[in-house]
Amino acid sequence: LLAYIGENYRDKIGSYKIITNGTIEPSAELIEIMQKYHVAAEISDYTNGVPQLKEKIESVVETYRKNNIQTYFLSAARWVDFGFEDVQNNYTIEQARAFFDYCHTRCRGYVDGKIRYCINAFFAERTLYGTEDINNMLDVVNMENTEKSRRKLVEFDLGYNEKGFLLMCQHCNGTVEINQHFIEVGKQCQNR
C-alpha cells in the first residue's frame, strides 16, 4: 500500500509517514519503499510507562536513521481512554452522526488488505465483539485504478459511509483531539 500510494500520489502528498510504537524492526522491503518515496517514521516513545521497551525502540530508531529515513521520536506523557468496554452513549442516529463528524479521527489503519477508517474502533470491535463494521473498512486490494475508485478512497478518508457513523461510536469517548479521559502510558491494563 505504501508503494502504491507513493507511486501514484506521492507528488500530491506533503507529509508522508508511518506511525509505529517502535517494537518491530522494519523489513528491508519497508526500508526500501520508505527511501524511494521519502516516507518518514514517527516512533511513539512509551518508555516512561514501559521502560523495558527502551533498548528495542532505540534499535528501531537506529535502523531508520542509518538508512536515511527521516525519523521523529515522539514523547507521549499520556494516552486517552477510548472507553470501548465501559462507554454506552445511547446516541440517536443523528447524535451518532454528529459525534462521528465532530470526532473525525485521523487514525487510519491497514489490516488484511483493508483500510480502516478508525483503527481503534476496528481493533476494539474485533476484540470485544468478534465483529467488523462494514462502514469502517475499504477493501483496497481489489480496488481498480479508476476515477470512481479514487473518488471512493477519498470519500472514505473524509468519513463518508452509508450510516454516517461507526457502530463503535456508541462505545467511544472520541479521538485524542476531543477526548478528555486520560490514562498513563502503558498503564491501561494494570488489573490484568
Task: Give residue spans per PLM region.
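Catalytic cores of alpha/beta
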Residues: 28-32
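A C-terminal junction/extension of Radical SAM enzymes
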Residues: 61-124
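C-terminal accessory region of radical SAM enzymes
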Residues: 68-81, 120-180
